[in-house]
Amino acid sequence: MIWKEILIRYGELSTKGRNKMDFIRRLRENIRHAFADLGHLHIRTERDRMFIAIENDAQMQTLVTGLPKIFGIQSFSPVAACEKDMESMKQLAITIMETFKDQPYTFKVEVKRTDKTFPLESHAIQREIGGYVLPQFNNLSVKVKQPDIELRVEVRHDATYMMAQVIPGAGGMPVGSNGKSLLMLSGGIDSPVAGYLMMKRGVRLEAIHFFSPPYTSQNSLEKVKVLANELTKFGANIRLHVIPFTEIQVLIKEKVPSNVSMTTTRRMMLKVADQVREEIGALAIVTGESLGQVASQTLESLTAINAVTNTPILRPLISSDKLEIIELAEQIGTYETSIQPFEDCCTIFTPASPKTKPKLEKVEHYESFSDFDELIARAVKNREVYIFPKKEEEQQQDKFADLL
């Protein structure tokens, strides 16, 4: 095995000043959590980069596959090592460059000599390795500025280290470095994408889903569980709070005029979410709303909905159009699950002509004739909580159940 370690370059952490080490510690914890199945990882941190020691090829492959999903990483590189003699360096350089034989590339060799006792200076090492590698590959040509491949060589005190591949990371900030919020997870396309974007900004998420049996099926709930589980691959556990919402929706249908019933439904959801948020110690509520996309997402509707709380409502998709949201959903792997045709509570009892510019005072007047507070308290108390990611044995049980 030639691979010795993985070098990780930080994303926005490089701009964080005195708080930088807190962000780095959070990133290290998230990496350990994401790869807990690999056992204890040996991670060394520096102010501008992080190193993960590699023990075998299987571990290396798992890390290379999973690290691009961890927020806070700008890029990373597999690093190989060899003895500190020119012959070993040349042979390692050939081995690394063998992986770039598929098409024409420009390249250069960049050398850093940390061990000043090594007899050759950096420029001499550069000429030796470059002059040895170039004749071995017909597809390579030298380019000093912005080459396709930069073979980086570092002569340290213990060994010589080399890297040539720079793999893009997810960028952003480590999940958990910017507090916790509650995501309203509907099961549609938008809300998982909103959750992803907030995680990218370092926000740890719990999720809330409104379930209205028998009007919504068990399949719709299972779909949301899959989406919650999908979001955990970006670096953290997620607790999903499932709210029994049938009583509240039936009362809205019976007592509130149909043209503002959707506004009231969203207001009651927000009231429930705010109580759960307070219980779990979250600082904000996250939604997948996009301005003007549907009747409940006009400025007038959002104003009427927001009026039930002083809690910050974060809407990362507010200026995105539907095609942009779909494209991102496809990229993060939630789209195919989101489009499964199972109704959620937002699609049942949908009025034929909902108000796009509801008046807050009228909505409050219609709601004043019903005691929603008691139903809200009961829904919060009777919620079910699921923790994701699922353990492997639980996933196997689900697959077996699908066969029955």
Curated annotation (Swiss-Prot):
Pathway connected to this protein: Cofactor biosynthesis; thiamine diphosphate biosynthesis
Keyword Cytoplasm: yes
Principal location class: cytoplasm
InterPro entries membership: Rossmann-like_a/b/a_fold, ThiI_AANH, ThiI_fer, ThiI_N, THUMP_dom, THUMP_ThiI, tRNA_STrfase, tRNA_sulfurtransferase_ThiI
Name of the top EC class for this enzyme: transferase
Binding site for ATP: 184-185, 209-210, 266, 288, 297
Keyword set, alphabetical order: ATP-binding, Cytoplasm, Nucleotide-binding, RNA-binding, Thiamine biosynthesis, Transferase, tRNA-binding
GO BP annotations, alphabetical order: thiamine biosynthetic process; thiamine diphosphate biosynthetic process; thiazole biosynthetic process; tRNA 4-thiouridine biosynthesis
Keyword ATP-binding: yes
Any one cellular-component term (Gene Ontology): cytosol
CDD domains, sorted: PPase_ThiI, THUMP_ThiI
Family stated for the protein in its record: Belongs to the ThiI family.
Physiological role: Catalyzes the ATP-dependent transfer of a sulfur to tRNA to produce 4-thiouridine in position 8 of tRNAs, which functions as a near-UV photosensor. Also catalyzes the transfer of sulfur to the sulfur carrier protein ThiS, forming ThiS-thiocarboxylate. This is a step in the synthesis of thiazole, in the thiamine biosynthesis pathway. The sulfur is donated as persulfide by IscS.
Protein name: Probable tRNA sulfurtransferase
Organism the protein comes from: Lysinibacillus sphaericus (strain C3-41)
Gene name linked to the record: thiI
